[in-house]
Amino acid sequence: MGLPAMKLQYDGPLTIATAGSRKSVSWKNQDVSWGELAARLATPLKTAETQDEYNTMRKAQKDEIKDVGGFVGGALRNGRRKAESIIHRSLVTLDIDSVPQGEDPWEVVTLVIGCAAILYSTHSHSPKAPRLRLVIPLSRKVTPDEYAALSRRIAGDIGIDMCDDTTYEAHRLMYWPSHSIDGEYRFEIQDGLWLDVD
C-alpha cells in the first residue's frame, strides 16, 4: 500500500477492494496485511480548505473534497462495487456518526468488543460533532448475509443508535482518511485477536 506496515502482534492477511474515487467503475481487489491497512489509515491526506470553509460548503462540494479514494472491506467480482458483486468480506466497517454528548465510542469498543480494531475520524469530524469509522478484522471471510448480521450485532454491542443505518451494506465503501488543513484527525488502534465470527 506504499507505506511500511505497522508492527502488530496480531497481524495477518486480508482482502480489500480499492479505487481512487467513489465513482470508480473499476475496483481492484488487493491482498494486504492488517498492519499495512493500519499504516494507511494512520496517515490521512490533508486538504487545502479550512474546517470552517468545509462546514459552509454544499453537500456536493463536501463529497468531492472528501473523496480521496477508498476501500471496501472485502473482495468484489468483476471490479464493480454493487451489492451483487460482493464475494466475501474480511473486515467489518461501521459508520459512527451519532455520538451522544460526552461519550467516547473508543472506550466502548475497547471495553465491549476487546478484539483488534481501528477507529479513525472522517473529513467531517470535529471534537464537538464526532464522525468516526470503526474497522474490525475477521477470523475468516464472511458472506454478505453473514456480514449484515455480524455488523448489526457489533453495532448493537457498542450502541446501534450511534451507527448509520446504511453501514450494514456489504458493498459499502470507506473513504481513505483525510481532514481539512486545520482539522483534527483521530486514529486509535487496539492490537488484539481478530474477531472470531464463529
Language model features with spans:
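Signature for HUH/AEP ssDNA processing cores
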Residues: 2-130, 137-149, 153
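Short, well-ordered strand-loop elements centered on a beta-strand within folded domains, enriched
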Residues: 7, 15-16, 184-191
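Long, charge-rich alpha-helical interaction segments
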Residues: 41, 191-198
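Metal-dependent nucleotidyl/phosphoryl-transfer cores and adjacent nucleic-acid-binding surfaces
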Residues: 94, 186, 193-195
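Short, glycine-/Ser/Thr-/acidic-enriched flexible segments
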Residues: 99, 181, 192-194
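Short, conserved secondary-structure transition motifs
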Residues: 126-127, 140-142, 163-189
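Conserved His + Asp/Glu catalytic blocks
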Residues: 157-161
